[in-house]
Regions:
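Bacterial N-terminal signal peptides that target proteins for export
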Residues: 1-7
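Bacterial N-terminal signal peptides
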Residues: 9-16
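Sec/Tat signal peptide C-region and signal peptidase I cleavage site
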Residues: 17-22
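N-terminal lobe/hinge region of extracytoplasmic solute-binding protein
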Residues: 28-78, 108, 186-190
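Extracytoplasmic/periplasmic ligand-capture domains
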Residues: 59-62, 79, 87-118, 126-130, ...
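Surface-exposed binding/hinge segments that line
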Residues: 75, 119-170
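Mature extracytoplasmic/periplasmic domains
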Residues: 162, 318-338, 492, 503-507
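Long beta-strand-rich cores associated with HINT superfamily self-processing modules
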Residues: 504-528
């Protein structure tokens, strides 16, 4: 038996020794909780789990509506000055008082070079200023009517704790030498982390000093990484775990037919897409030397037309995905109905490649996670086969998400030529997509922090600036529409594939709240 299997078994065995009266919630995910530093990796699973421990100035309720969090209320004093009134009597888990100093520190920390959440506070150049111990002003260089839309996952950290533990700088997502904040947590939220063994298990207990009123009935939460799909499903069906995510699509009917568990399915707001290196003068992982084929719009369009997303949604995703024409879910942008995804056309794709100077195609390495999104590696395998039909030889490099993100994101200097990624706009608004995916960036992640391939167009930069400050909804939607037309229908900057469906497996004993943002917030879970 492999060491990791033994460790997982030991974790389950230890958990089973708890008293019968204790409501212990055990859950498994396909990937690891790589870091406890909430600024190191802008990833849904990480932010969701840490959202049980850390809190933002705002929160989102079960219906994703913005509600007060660590800020009791806020007001716009003028278009470029917002004031937030902080809750009094809130403490971090180590007993320190939560004050305005922590908010100012957290704002400054979010802009540090290694931070993966630089776009949480926009526009760039926004300053947090302490008014008194429980009041903070945010001074903006230009208006932003949705300033606080992403602050439910901009988690506030203790200034004193970070300074005392050499954690003023965020833990880089690719860091091998883990910082104190990457291995320990000190939040204000409903749970505290009492044990963290990366790759094995993380243990949570209720925070007895939390300022809010608990809705859960859990005495202990144990998270375990189970990367193997079959093992994860077996653990759910046997009762070794109370919750498993994701349930492979081919196992949904089997789980629903069992006596002990069921699958909670619903639409997710995440868009799965493909991206290209459009930045380097020479494509790093290719047999083409001295130039970069992806700088040619004809090549990008050829790749788009060479991929049959309808077949992927039908066969690979077993009809549990909605093909997308845009980099945002139509649930979040009303004018998405005006866009139609082009049908696959291998003949036209070959013609475009020939016109671009690649009549025989070329080779390129594709980076892909194998434990992050639903059927991620299978999607990449399908893309590889489809592109082979137009003369493109794809060398697939599929890796666990820890290695994958460390390679392709800012901490790895965007080390990819062609990649698969997923994106959920934290604000549930198109500006987040434009600012993160279409804004020009540099090698330090300034600008479009998650624009891995560095799509860059000065016209798009102007659209992004205009969208940020436009208050008229109709005018703003038209600006967003024009931006998407530029990015997709003219520049072919990305290949949006689909919005995947959620597939959470849960014990019949569990009452679960499932939101479309796919965050596992067990402070709402109850075990009967």
């Amino acid at each position: 038996m492999k060491l990791k299997t033994l460790l997982i078994a030991a974790a389950f065995a230890a958990a089973s020794l708890t008293t019968a009266s204790a409501a212990t919630f055990r859950f498994a995910f396909q990937g690891d909780l790589k870091s406890l530093d909430p600024y190191s990796l802008n990833e849904t699973f990480t932010h969701g789990v840490l959202g049980n421990v850390y809190e933002g100035l705002t929160k989102r309720d079960k219906g994703l509506k913005i509600i007060p969090g660590l800020a009791e209320r806020w007001e716009v004093l003028e278009p470029t000055r917002w004031r937030f009134y902080l809750r009094k009597g809130v403490k971090f888990q180590n007993g320190e008082d939560f004050t305005a100093d922590d908010v100012v520190f957290s704002a400054e920390r979010s802009f540090k070079p290694a931070s993966d959440i630089k776009t949480r506070i926009q526009p760039a150049g926004t300053k947090a200023v302490k008014v008194d111990d429980h009041t903070v002003d945010f001074i903006l260089p230009s208006p932003n009517p949705i300033l606080h839309y992403e602050w439910d996952t901009w988690y506030i950290m203790s200034k004193k704790w970070a300074e005392s533990n050499n954690s003023v700088e965020p833990q880089p997502g690719a860091g091998q030498q883990m910082s104190y904040a990457a291995l320990h947590a000190n939040g204000t939220g409903p749970f505290i982390i009492t044990e963290h063994q990366a790759g094995v298990k993380t243990v949570f207990k209720p925070n007895p000093n939390w300022w809010g009123k608990p809705e859960h009935n859990l005495d202990e939460v144990i998270f375990t990484t189970i990367s193997n799909d079959a093992t994860r499903v077996a653990a759910l069906l046997s009762g070794d775990v109370d919750f498993a995510d994701p349930i492979p699509l081919q196992d949904v009917d089997r789980v629903n037919a069992s006596a002990n568990a069921r699958v909670l399915q619903g639409p997710e707001l995440r868009t799965i897409f493909l991206g290209f290196d459009q930045y380097r003068d020479e494509l790093k992982y290719s047999n083409i030397k001295g130039k970069n084929p992806f700088k040619d719009v004809r090549v990008r369009k050829a790749f788009y037309l060479g991929i049959d997303e309808n077949a992927i949604a039908d066969k690979v995703m077993r009809k549990a995905a909605v093909p997308s024409a845009l980099m945002i879910s139509p649930l979040l942008f009303p004018l998405a109905k005006d866009f139609t995804r082009p049908k696959a056309d291998p003949a036209e794709a070959k013609k475009l490649l020939a016109e671009a100077g690649y009549p025989n195609g070329f080779e390129v390495t594709m980076d892909c996670p194998n434990d992050r999104y639903v059927n991620d590696e299978a999607i990449c395998q399908a893309v590889t086969a489809m592109l082979a039909r137009i003369g493109i030889k794809v060398n697939l490099l599929a890796q666990p998400k820890a290695k994958y993100f460390a390679k392709i994101l800012v901490s790895g200097h965007y080390d990819s030529s062609f990649y698969l990624l997923g994106w959920t706009p934290g604000s549930f608004d198109s500006w987040n997509v434009l600012a993160n995916m279409y804004a020009c960036r540099d090698e330090n992640g300034k600008g479009g922090n998650n624009n891995v391939g560095n799509y860059c167009n000065p016209k798009m930069e102007e659209f992004i600036k205009q969208v940020l400050v436009e208050n008229d909804t109709a005018k703003r939607d038209q600006l967003i529409k024009a931006a998407y037309q530029l990015g997709q229908e003219q520049d072919w900057g990305y290949i949006p594939l689909h919005q995947q469906a959620l597939a959470w497996g849960a014990s019949q004993k569990m009452k679960i709240v499932q939101r479309a943002d796919n965050q596992i917030l067990f402070y709402w879970f109850r075990k009967e």
